[in-house]
Amino acid sequence: MKNTFGSALALTIFGESHGRAIGGVLDGMAAGVPVDEGFIAACMDKRRARGDGLSTPRVEADNVQLLSGVVNGHTTGTAIALMIENQNIRSGDYAKTADLLRPGHADYTAYAKYHGFQDARGGGHFSGRITAALVAGGAIVLGALNRAGIDITTHIARCAGISDTPFALDDAAALAAQVSVLESRDEGFALLDASVEEPMKTAIRAAGSEGDSVGGILETAILGLPAGVGEPYFDSVESLISHMAFSVPAVKGIEFGTGFGFADLKGSEANDAFRMKGDSVVTATNHNAGINGGITNGMPVVFRTAVKPTPSIYKEQETVDYIAKQDAPLSIQGRHDPCIVPRAAIVQTCAAALAVGDLMTARYGTAWMERPTSYRREGL
């Protein structure tokens, strides 16, 4: 099992849904980087369940304990160990269905790989609960990126068949204004168009009342990345962002910029024309989402991820009793989200921050953290 992402800047995660704690170790941060625990807490709060019919009744405090690597609000340059206690656990909910494979979950694949030694309580290490560690570690990196002039944010582009206003892919100024609006809001329901919030919430609650669930699409924007970050082929910007994006449970698809829409365009329509804006090279359009040949060109990076409906539903399903080796009906117990899309928005933001932080460190070393306002002028 590989629990580490990143090479120049790496996060290792640990824990299970119903274990004593979950957490991570962030390695590669320079010494002297400010760490705002209030900012980390705010990110965690956007992910936290509220027991409001829109998310799981399992409400956790999600207080992040920084065990090492941070003193007096600054990094020491050593590994940052962080831990989040699991305090609201009801493992008994899973006892009656322990031998039944839950459709859409990793029960069967985990059994095939780990031969019954996996922790199956609440999904164990496969649970979305583990994304709390991604948010905690990613928030530290996101704070450092923000100080270097790089902003990352995510909104709910679509949920339960209802769409929000999309990001302005071809208008960098309008996109920056949209990002500013989203970052100014503290609530965990990230939308640009406030008029679709109640219809979305109503649809989520309706699915939950029927014992069902719904999915959606998240849209993430990355502003301020300098040109020249990334590698061709295997460590391309798309490759590393996708690597992290698919590490968020329930994500089943991704596209950058115009994405699958390229299939219906001609080359004359798909190419982004270059032009000068002062001393900077920009593109007239941004179909390619700020990436050419796996390397950033300085334009905004925009990508969308498809999030499947929560697989834990309360409707009876057909499955298999893998101990008795026979077909069986399944009625899931426990506490589950009717939709994880709203809570997953901050997870995708922090996942992207980890990928971008690794890319930036591979390109600039730790200079972007140590000298966030001047590293671009140093000719690195």
What are these regions (language model features)?
Residues 14-20, 135, 210-327:
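Glycine-rich anion/phosphate-binding loop at the beta-strand->alpha-helix junction
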Residues 1-58:
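N-terminal, positively charged regions that mediate nucleic acid binding
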Residues 10-15, 118-130, 227-231, 288-291, ...:
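A short glycine/serine-rich beta->alpha loop
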Residues 98-124, 319-338:
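Short acidic, glycine/tyrosine-flanked loop/strand segments centered on an H-E-D-like triad
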Residues 312-380:
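Internal helix-turn-beta structural module
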